[in-house]
Amino acid sequence: LQGYFMKRIGEYVRSKGKEVMGWDELTNSFIPEGAVIFGWQGMGNAALKAADRGHRFVMTPARVMYLIRYQGPQWFEPLTYFGNNTLKDVYQYEPVQKNWKPEYASLLMGVQASLWTEFCNRPEDVDYLVFPRLAALAEVGWSRPEQKNWDLFLKAMDRYNEHLDVKGIGYARSMYNIQHTSTPVDGALQIKLECIRPDVEIRYTTCLLYTSPSPRD
């Protein structure tokens, strides 16, 4: 039924001088002539099935390019969709993979981040989910892999965030949050604290009574 519907609607759309664009579920049946496929499931690899049939495609994998997901530890973040796509996850994504067939790169139209707004009640909620990850998306789209440098990007982000402050845009500061993982070891728990920013200093205490921030020395 999906294939029949897409064949009919594809013919109609083309008769109006327009292009058909659709999600990668189209690869499960008939793909309209000339249709552009958006690869979203998992890492977007279903779009490559369309490329094998000569179709152009856009990479927008849910695992790293769905901006509705949390940007850091969920207990620090406003309620949104499940899963984490940190600023670093977005920045490190490379749409062109080394194991691709040579013709795939020529059919790739670009990369896209997607945002669904069922958890956004105000424009400010959209700002929080989009910024600063939108800057990382720009780096993915415009920078070659060998040109990317996470540390330099963070320095640029500090200046960019000052610009957002001036504009009154309420961006996420999740890049400064501390993530912890706990692992059972010999009847005890081993705790690992980490931050996606290497310049963040992590201080802690084993004292259960909080009185003031931990001293530097």
Where are the regions that the model predicts?
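Hydrophobic faces of well-ordered beta-strands that scaffold small-molecule active sites
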Residues: 20-22, 37-38, 57-59, 109-113
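Conserved small/polar residues in nucleotide/adenosyl-binding loops
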Residues: 210-217
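Beta-strand signatures of extracellular beta-sandwich domains
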Residues: 203-205
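Substrate-binding cleft of secreted/luminal carbohydrate-active enzymes
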Residues: 109-151
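Active-site neighborhood of glycoside hydrolase catalytic domains
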Residues: 1-33, 41-43, 47
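C-terminal functional modules
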Residues: 120, 138-198
